[in-house]
């Protein structure tokens, strides 16, 4: 599986997920600088108030 791993509004980059990982994620939240976005492999548990999208196809988390 290949997932995007750039932060917020950086140019798109991808990473090849290891260990048979089947999910990509995109996490979004707001702080004093505005909206922040984090992308990567897996489907992490998030705290209340954080928007999380998990998906299972190559580069689905941009």
UniProtKB/Swiss-Prot annotation:
Keywords: Acetylcholine receptor inhibiting toxin, Disulfide bond, Ion channel impairing toxin, Neurotoxin, Postsynaptic neurotoxin, Secreted, Toxin. It is found in: Secreted. Its main location: secreted. One of its GO terms (molecular function) is ion channel regulator activity. Disulfide bonds join 3-24, 17-41, 43-54, 55-60. InterPro entries: Snake_3FTx, Snake_toxin-like_sf, Snake_toxin_con_site, Toxin_cobra-type. GO terms for cellular component: extracellular region. Residues 1-20 are annotated as: Disordered. Expressed by the venom gland. Pfam families: Toxin_cobra-type. Gene3D superfamilies: CD59. Binds to muscle nicotinic acetylcholine receptor (nAChR) and inhibit acetylcholine from binding to the receptor, thereby impairing neuromuscular transmission. Belongs to the three-finger toxin family. Short-chain subfamily. Type I alpha-neurotoxin sub-subfamily. This is Short neurotoxin 1. It comes from Naja mossambica (Mozambique spitting cobra).
């Amino acid at each position: 599986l290949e997932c995007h791993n750039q932060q917020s509004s950086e140019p798109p980059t991808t990473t090849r997920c290891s260990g048979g990982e089947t999910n990509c994620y995109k996490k979004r939240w707001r702080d004093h600088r505005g909206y922040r976005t984090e992308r990567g492999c897996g489907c992490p548990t998030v705290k209340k108030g954080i928007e999380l999208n998990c998906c299972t196809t190559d580069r689905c988390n941009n």
